[in-house]
Amino acid sequence: TGAILGFVGGRNYQENQNNHAFDTKRSPASTTKPLLAYGIAIDQGLMGSETILSNYPTNFANGNPIMYANSKGTGMMTLGEALNYSWNIPAYWTYRMLREKGVDVKGYMEKMGYEIPEYGIESLPMGGGIEVTVAQHTNGYQTLANNGVYHQKHVISKIESSDGKITVSYTHLTLPT
């Protein structure tokens, strides 16, 4: 439904009144891989969990190696393995393939509530060039849990006066991605 049932905005309100769940943006790092690369490729019918992907050493266009911890790559693996171990190189190749095939990655991400300023960043599927709030990123992930249907996040479902009259009622926004 998109309803937020509870959240923690910070550990000590007396020291910091910033609501970190809704207001603080951070790099989502590798947690973008299922949304920005693999989920879209699967939805487009281009890949499945057993699709074999390259995890051989690869460099970005500027010559810097694409790394995973201390490893530059290991060989071939399935998409499921790449996702399970969060390998960077298969995510890079998947995202690159989506762009080369002209898949509307921006459209997918916007339907899940993401505002990404630049889609040409090679490290984007590893979280480079994107910052999100916890609430925004959680809302993107609920789209996966809801079989590709986006439900806009909301905290208040209705406001009711003391006499029982509903003064505000939330209307659910659902969009297929």
What spans do the regions from the language model cover?
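Periplasmic/cell-envelope proteins involved in peptidoglycan metabolism and beta-lactam response
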Residues: T1-R26, S30-T31, G48-T51, M109
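Structural recognition of the beta-strand scaffold that forms the well-ordered cores
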Residues: L5-F7, W93-T94, P125
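Conserved catalytic neighborhood of penicillin-recognizing serine enzymes
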Residues: M47-V105, I121, Y150, S162-L173
